[in-house]
A protein has these predicted regions:
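N-terminal subdomain of nucleotide-sugar transferases
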Residues: 1-62, 248
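Acidic donor-binding loop of glycosyltransferase active sites
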Residues: 175, 290-307, 318-321
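A short, well-ordered alpha-helix in the C-terminal region of glycosyltransferases
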Residues: 355, 362-377, 386-389
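Conserved acidic donor-binding segment of nucleotide-sugar-dependent glycosyltransferases
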Residues: 340-347, 355-361
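Donor nucleotide-sugar binding/catalytic pocket of nucleotide-sugar-dependent glycosyltransferases
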Residues: 62, 157-160, 168-211
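Acceptor-binding helix/loop patch of EC 2.4 sugar-transfer enzymes
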Residues: 72-85, 130-165
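Short hydrophobic beta-strand element within catalytic cores of glycosyltransferases
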Residues: 311-314, 321-325
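Conserved catalytic-core segment of nucleotide-activated headgroup transferases in glycan assembly
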Residues: 201-211, 216-294
Length: 402
């Protein structure tokens, strides 16, 4: 098949969840299909990644979008038009004209739009379109707004309402909408009942899977939280770990360390000697893997909605037991006390940490069960095959509709 894939980021290096997802899909889809990639970029040095991506793509087109989102032009456009800020700051005239030219020149089988907010670049066309929602964006932003001081909320909430309107609008424009979980699929169905939907889950990178499950140090445990701290949910989780979980743990344990790692981790301030902040460069996959390999537990106090968490899938693939909130594991086909331990407040997190460290059988069961599930359900080879079938269904559905 000839696939036109449009992404709001350059999918290399695999620094964010979206980039990890797209790169792994490209890796496997390119074996049987011709992929024409159109990606938005902010900084000129991102163009150097074209060389790496060439092996997966028939053509690559990088299109400039605003380097700094908070430009006066963007702010005024978001305030005085019907478009939400997310669409405004991700819009590129270059991408719009590039896609228009590609559609004239190449006979595509399907257009793959990764996120709804790149859909404005795609003109009216007879080519069937698959819109992939990595998360329900307006719900993510609503969660953020709900945490703001009450006197600020009304001003920002207007943008959330616009976001919801346009997200729903582009769901209706697509031939089929795919989500990363059944949970998000049901949320879309609640909003617009007659939308055609499918589920294309996230996965764990091939490099994260251990060949054998290793014994971990439970005597002097290392508790890891890893994420990209550009995202609000990860900052929220880091602060909860330091301010809520850590003081409770210190009352119960002595020899332990908390590692908070990721891009922009340096934004996190703490003077507690038990917390180690580790900055990870965007292309340093080896450091990420080593942290997963050398930690004892992965703690994920995530309270923001949407998507599925690649960080949790990576921990499962690495044989690292996970303690997370109910929200954190939403959309994943995993069970409490079988694949992970669920904790929804600071007391429960401490309780589950102590339980996992003191019960060797439970610890090993969590390792083995989550690893086997990741291997079976959350590997990118199988996921890409599911996506190929969805492409065929999109094409068939469009033919029947016409």
């Amino acid at each position: 098949m000839k696939i036109l894939m449009v992404t709001p980021y350059v999918p290399y290096p695999p620094a964010s969840g979206g980039q990890i997802r797209t790169l792994n899909l490209l890796k496997y889809l390119s074996r049987k299909n011709d992929i024409y990639l159109v990606s938005l970029y902010k900084h000129e040095d991102e163009k150097r990644h074209i060389e790496f991506l060439t092996k997966y793509c028939k053509e690559i087109h990088l299109c400039k979008r605003p380097e700094k989102p908070w430009q006066l032009k963007n702010i005024l456009t978001a305030i005085f038009t019907s478009k939400p800020f997310l669409i405004v700051r991700n819009f590129s005239e270059d991408a719009k004209s590039t896609i228009k030219d590609l559609l004239k020149r190449v006979q595509f089988d399907v257009i793959h739009s990764e996120t709804f907010y790149v859909m404005p670049h795609i003109p009216k066309t007879h080519v069937p379109t698959l819109l992939v929602e990595q998360t329900i964006e307006y719900k993510v932003y609503k969660h953020f707004v709900d945490g703001l001081p009450f006197f600020i909320r009304p001003f920002i909430f207007i943008d959330v309402l616009k976001l919801r309107h346009w997200e729903r609008y582009y769901w209706n424009q697509a031939t089929l909408v795919a989500t990363v979980s059944n949970h998000d699929k049901e949320l879309i169905k609640e909003e617009v009942s007659d939308i055609n939907t499918a589920v294309i889950p996230n996965g764990a990178g091939d490099e994260m899977f251990e060949k054998t499950i290793k014994h971990r140090n439970t005597i002097d445990p290392v508790l890891l939280f890893l994420g990209n701290f550009f995202w609000l949910q990860n900052m929220e989780a880091a602060q909860f770990t330091i301010k809520k979980i850590l003081p409770q743990l210190e009352k119960k344990m002595q020899n332990f360390k908390i590692v908070i790692a990721g891009q922009q981790a340096k934004k996190i301030n703490t003077t507690n000697s038990k917390v180690q902040i580790v900055e990870i460069e965007e292309d340093n996959a080896d450091k990420v893997k080593k942290l997963y390999q050398t930690s004892t537990l992965f703690i994920a106090p995530i309270f923001g909605p949407g998507g599925t968490r690649l960080k949790i899938l990576a921990a499962m693939a690495a044989g690292l037991p996970v303690i997370s909130t109910s929200v954190g594991i939403e959309g994943l086909n995993i069970k409490d006390n079988q694949h992970v331990l669920v904790a929804n407040n600071k007391e429960q997190f401490v309780e589950k940490v102590l339980l996992a460290l003191s019960n060797q059988k439970l610890y090993q069961d969590l390792q083995n069960n989550s690893y086997e599930l990741a291997l079976k359900k959350y590997n990118w080879k199988n996921i890409s095959e599911e996506l190929e079938q969805v492409y065929k269904n999109v094409k068939k559905h469009d033919e029947n509709r016409n």
